[in-house]
Amino acid sequence: MRVKVRFTGMIRHYVGEKERDYDLPEGSTAGDLLLLLGREYGSRMPAHMWNSGRERFHPLVIAMRKGEPLHGEDGPLRDGDEIFLLSRLAGG
């Protein structure tokens, strides 16, 4: 299945990309995608966004689909999903 991830705000700054498509195995979950993203980009992010020891995003980093947060890492992804990765923290 193919999923598009759009990076926003400071996450876009650290990732260096606006968006990217991922081909994932059928049955992949939100947790699978977040782990993939963290392993790929986590080294570019500060510790308040990615915890490299636990291989987890900080709770202030959220993934959203259709305007709703993806709750629970076991939530299934679907072919064609568009996921927004954003931080609840923003400067101003």
Q: Can you say where each PLM-predicted feature lies in the sequence?
A:
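Ubiquitin-like/PB1-type beta-grasp interaction modules and other compact soluble beta-rich domains
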Residues: M1-G91
